[in-house]
């Protein structure tokens, strides 16, 4: 059987799964609230993937075209993501292995290689969205040409190198700071634009009438596809193992509960950010007659004159930059997890980062060079289509494994959880395949 050669093990950042496993101690005699604080963190790293520029594009278009009416789709998509991420975390805590490694152990080599390639493709697609978002942020904030901004994003490998010697908790703190930056920017934006909050609250109630036409249904599926990230399912099952958990059933049950709370709180932050983007677009654009804003550049261009202050545009750019940079770390971690889990292969983290970014830079450069600055919107759509296509291949083994009593024991999915999970699999798979077909059909 062909095996990839092992490469030198030279860690340069706290990203290699086997090196950070069990690095955060949680003494059993700690008070519950201190245990919760020690356990908080993995959910934050996962939540970053739910705030990438692909989400921005779909939320902005939904808000500008249909006002607040699709806000409930953001809510339901986030709830679906919470269910799947809780399953992923439980798998990692109970088995002590991540989804990629378990897939390697339980499936045939050919199927494992296909899974690995598809998962790597999803990371590159996500990184493409980050490249475009950061390049656009450099353009909006500093006036750098889009192509120049794309080139600047290659320097984020230096950020990974700069984390040499940092521990995993410091990495989580950095990501938390970036998430808070995004949240603060949108808090100020909403304070400036002053949306109609009763209408916002009413839009949280599901309204199937809002999806009766083809166009809002298309956008709703786009929101769903942009919200649930496939590589996050691999990521979460691994990084929860940074917490030291006793192998006794009560200790694992407590860890599962703490992880569930961490996941819900962290993804609620992502929900607030995505909801704020849609609400801002609805209040600033839809309410003022600009119902054709379909990309991030147009949103930034119109925001300042509508709000009446240059601060609005600056905050928008800062939040976009923070969203792109925060995913630098999680993309690198997820890549290491895939290589170590599927292939038993470890390489220096900066090399891993450089390889992923190089693959993402190629379509970004070609697209912008050939189609101009407005290619960003099209490329973001393509990145979300790729992510949507890969998602079922990550969901299926996750749901199947967490429902396997031989593997999970008493922690296996109950009937209700299994029913909800398989329904989500069916709905998300059909929705994403329909979205892929619509995009390919033009």
Curated annotation (Swiss-Prot):
Localization of this protein: Cell inner membrane
Gene Ontology BP annotations: iron ion transmembrane transport
Keyword Amino-acid biosynthesis: no
One cellular component (GO) term of this entry: plasma membrane
A Pfam family it matches: Nramp
TM region positions: 67-87, 141-163, 173-193, 216-236, 264-284, 302-322, 357-377, 379-399, 420-440
Major subcellular location class: membrane
Family of the protein in this entry: Belongs to the NRAMP family.
Designated name of the protein: Divalent metal cation transporter MntH
